[in-house]
């Protein structure tokens, strides 16, 4: 059985908190298959945003990234896991 792991990372005050998160994205870059950034842009550029990460590789290493991101100020991490044969 394979697992398809996706993290949703909510970032508040992204201009202040993204640099630390970006450092972790770089460190774990080989485990990030897809990265999608979302933020509100109508009438203004929102200071808050959402990043979706489709993970790849060793599950322990992927979960390690989630723990490190969640430990950063201004970030919240939610996990989705889909299993399939």
Task: Kindly give the residue locations of the regions a language model identified.
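Long, contiguous binding/interaction regions
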Residues: 1-85
């Amino acid at each position: 059985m394979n697992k398809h792991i996706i993290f949703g990372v909510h970032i508040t005050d992204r201009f202040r908190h993204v640099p630390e998160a970006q450092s972790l994205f770089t460190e774990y870059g080989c485990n990030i298959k897809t990265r999608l950034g979302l933020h509100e842009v109508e009438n203004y550029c929102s200071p808050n945003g959402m990043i979706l990460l489709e993970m790849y590789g060793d599950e322990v290493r992927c979960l390690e990234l989630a723990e490190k991101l969640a430990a950063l100020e201004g970030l919240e991490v939610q996990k989705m896991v889909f299993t399939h044969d």
